[in-house]
Amino acid sequence: MRILSAAEIEELNVSENEIAVCALGAVILYLKDTQKKDEIEAPSELEMYDTEKYMKLDMSARRNLELTKSMMTGDKRHSLLWVIDKTKTAAGKRMIRSWLERPLMSIAKITKRQNAVGELCDNPILRDEIRQALTGVSDIERLLTRIVYSTANAKELKSLQSTLEKLPSIKAKLADSSSYLLKAVYNDIDLLEDIRSLIDSAIVDEPPFTVREGGMIKEGFDKDIDELKSIMNDGAGIIASIENEQRELTGIPKLKVGYNKVFGYYIEVTNSYKDLVPETYIRKQTLTNCERYITQELKDLEGKIIGAKERCIALEYQMLCKIRESISNEVKRLQKTARALATLDVLASLSEVAVNNNYVCPQITNDGTINIKDGRHPVVEALLEDTPFVPNDAKLDLNENRCEIITGPNMAGKSTYMRQIALITLLAQIGSFVPAKSAQIGIVDAIYTRVGASDDLATGQSTFMVEMNEVAEILKNATSRSLIILDEIGRGTSTFDGMSIARAVLEFVCKQKNARCEISFLRRIITSLLLWRGFLTELRIIQ
């Protein structure tokens, strides 16, 4: 395996980060083992993941909020991703999932996404044209990986060509865009005409599935391949042509060109004409009535005819390798265009969802206020179909509304309400519009959740132990900018002990961590306990 030089590591901007260098080495070693190659090319660029730039979402939050898969079914359906993913391309699906799992912390970046989504919302004709144009676009990133690792076949190259042919139309649609992000997409789309032209001129329209079948290279692209194909397709005609040519040159009317397994191709002349045989003929066999000769030209042709198919397949494969190498040299241009198309796909998807579901553009601030008017749970609303979702308000800030206590009976919607606030906050920070009449979202650095009850048989932990461990992690990691969702904590033990734990946790979250918190209780007695502590001024009770 090739070792990266200090200069290469420096170019990747990771030389000063020892952990990043170690991680890069591990990735390259993994690629070597899985791709079965002795030498792995260094990556053209690396993106450093800065945790300070993205909202923190631990596995518990991802699971409880059902971001990418449903807890009930274990698949995408009925998750938040299922609601917002209306993308048309494979790369777009990967990117929208990445956005969902990494909400932004920068108001400027969020606003750029919002403006692009808003522009597409306001221009339905443009949005529909873009989504239609993206339909059928191949996965350039995956194709490029196969091309770089020399595993792409001719059909996959034609698939890439088909996608490149769509680029001029897609780019033209963005020419008059006004938002920063759509302008950036326009500038980043490289038409890649040289690559499209190369594939179009080299590969037949309907190539075979495997590269060892031959028949991949177009006629006229390579003269050696054309010659071999001509020999393969018209071997008998070529022999007849040589026979007529030699008759005219020698004046021997009964000259024949034949073939046997011993001598291969030969020229046969009867004894009555052997005096006319030119000196360039080489005698190979004497028979009773004739002589048999060979020429250098005939031997060369024999070699071409006999091995024409094998050599043609080999030459076509060599040519395919050269084409793949030429495309690999343009990897940065292809990657940039692929990312631009994926970004456009995601923005079009978010705008489609916003228009179809009556979402609004939230106001993003740094003051810690979460103020939602007529908010709706995006997944529950999608599942209700013809039944309207009953909207509700929410307000959290860093002052007297730091915490909301939600009380009510089982199946009253307490968990749905709390998850709704978290999901609206998360959607706002990925740059999406949100299901509400209006929304003001103060940037959240993390969402922590403690929802549901289950034990862990593998580690021998009871339901109560699992719950307390999760709460401890939240109390340790939460900051004043975090949003905490606590659903009936303390239910894994006795009523009195559970309320004591709940009160202590609530005081710590609001007084020590100063975090915004949503907490639900089945038992209304908790209100009187908090009132007794003089703590009610910092809470808003929802019943």
Enumerate the predicted regions with their spans.
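ATPase nucleotide-binding head domains, primarily ABC-like/P-loop NTPase cores
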Residues: 17, 88, 99, 270-299, ...
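Amphipathic alpha-helical transducer elements in NTP-driven molecular machines
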Residues: 17-25, 77-81, 90-93, 107, ...
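Charged catalytic and DNA/RNA-contacting regions of genome-maintenance
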Residues: 1-119, 132-135, 139-148, 152-244, ...
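Amphipathic alpha-helical coiled-coil segments
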Residues: 110, 117, 127-133, 160, ...
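Glycine- and acidic
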Residues: 8-13, 96-100, 120-126, 145, ...
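Amphipathic alpha-helical "coupling" segments that flank catalytic cores
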Residues: 118-124, 530-535
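Amphipathic heptad-repeat alpha-helical coiled-coil/stalk segments that mediate oligomerization
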Residues: 1, 6, 55-59, 67, ...
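Charged, surface-exposed helical/loop "interaction arms" that form contiguous linear patches used
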Residues: 149, 153, 163-166, 219-220, ...
